[in-house]
Amino acid sequence: MSLLLENLIEEDTIFFAGSISEYDDLQMVIAGAKSKFPRSMLSIFNIVPRTMSKYELELIHNENITGAMFTTMYNIRNNLGLGDDKLTIEAIENYFLDPNNEVMPLIINNTDMTTVIPKKSGRRKNKNMVIFRQGSSPILCIFETRKKINIYKENMESVSTEYTPIGDNKALISKYAGINILNVYSPSTSMRLNAIYGFTNKNKLEKLSTNKELESYSSSPLQEPIRLNDFLGLLECVKKNIPLTDIPTKD
């Protein structure tokens, strides 16, 4: 199993983010397969943000963006190669906003993960799979733009035979297997880390404002795993208490 996800999910892949029904859909996956982006919980859903499109981009908003990313402290430490060094708030921000990252996929207010289909494991199908394992230290990171940014959508009625780069300093609302994700391009130039939250053993969130609080949280990992139903409840709680960007889309 990939070390990126070793402490993030169970031993087997537990979610299936939808089959590729058409060759064009396969091309769309390929269009982003080599992009550089910070790994997060969205990796569970096989979400690879695209950096190219064959559709005309249509401007729909110009506004400030607030979005969320779920991951684990282990995931960040492993990707940064920190070894025994302490993970700091600055390191977390640098990981997500590394200038080498071409795109950052964000969860927004109208991101609905209830449509995700659990993958069968053997002959059994567990509808309440583990999202964050016992012993892990999951965190929720809230990002916001420094200033207003153009938000686009793809005009599916205006298609080209060739893919073109989406470009920098913009955001694109995209749908991956029924999940609305907001991709921010060249995030290091437009985004900043606003807040970090940890998960308590009562499936609640606590704000981690200092490196001391972050270190204390990492020394008290989850005593019980967070399963799908609990995670969906946490996500709804986040949406109610944190003003994430809402971008209505038509199915």
Swiss-Prot record:
**Cellular compartments annotated:** Virion; Host cytoplasm
Named from the GO MF annotations, one term is: structural molecule activity
Q: Which domain of life is it from?
A: Viruses
Q: TM spans, by residue?
A: none
Keywords from the UniProt entry:
Host cytoplasm, Late protein, Virion
Q: How is it modified after translation?
A: Undergoes morphogenesis-associated proteolysis which cleaves the 28 kDa to a 25-kDa product. Proteolytic cleavage of major core proteins P4a (OPG136), P4b (OPG129), and VP8 (OPG098), which occurs at a late stage of core formation, is required for production of infectious mature virions (MV).
Site Cleavage: which residues?
18-19, 32-33
**Positions annotated as propeptide:** 1-32
Q: Which Pfam families match?
A: Pox_VP8_L4R
Q: Which InterPro entries match?
A: VP8_pox_nuc-bd
Give the main localization category.
virion
User: Which family is this protein grouped under?
Assistant: Belongs to the orthopoxvirus OPG098 family.
Record's function text:
Major core structural protein.
Put simply, this protein is called Core protein VP8
Annotated source species = Monkeypox virus
